[in-house]
Amino acid sequence: ETGEGIITQYIILPGIQFFYNDFHMSNGQNQNKLPHADVLELNHCREGRFECRFANGTYQYIGSGDLAINLLSNQTVSTSFPLSHYHGISITIDLQKADSVIRKIDEMTGGLDIDLFSIANGFCKNGTCAVIRNQNKINHIFSELYCTKPYMHASYLKVKVLELLLYLGTEKIQNTQVKVPYFAHTQVKKVKEIQKYMVSNLRQHYTLE
């Protein structure tokens, strides 16, 4: 064991799950042993840094203020926290199940206009992952989620998740997305070896040459 972690789960609506993630450890665990191409995952990092290794040997990272959006179509091998702590929120959406619920809400409210499949296609074409970095509106939505009182969770989380989905469905925000590069295993291994060497030789002066 490398520390401790707490995941607090809430069922927002049928097909939509919400998680508060609080970790004080360096190594996480694989949470996606099998790919789920019809599940959309949103990950917002409040503090720390998150590393994810996929079965094809590539890595992806998110840091403070990042919102990662991806379909669970890639098999995850391992996860870790390079800074030994991580605090954030995850939202998983089963597109088929949640879509029917969203449509019913749309009928009752008269024009909610949330298209989950359009959001998934807009951000995750060809199974890629997208990250929105430090976007004020998104950070504002999540800042309120982090401060929600426990007695308000049952209703307030529903409202804020719907607000987030409504915002992500706009063409403007989809055009600001930043594609996250995948890092090869050899690149990551080399960087980690350099980091390990530098930490073990703190008295030595290093340059970028």
Regions from the language model: what does each represent?
Residues 22-24, 43-45, 92, 199:
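Residue-level recognition of well-ordered beta-strand positions that form the cores
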Residues 21, 31-34, 52-57, 103:
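Short, conserved acidic/polar surface loops in the N-terminal third of protein domains
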Residues 1, 57-58:
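N-terminal accessory interaction module
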Residues 166-174, 193, 197-209:
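Basic/polar phosphate-binding segments, predominantly the helix-turn-helix DNA-binding elements
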Residues 53, 62-184, 191:
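Alpha-helical bundle regulatory/interaction domains
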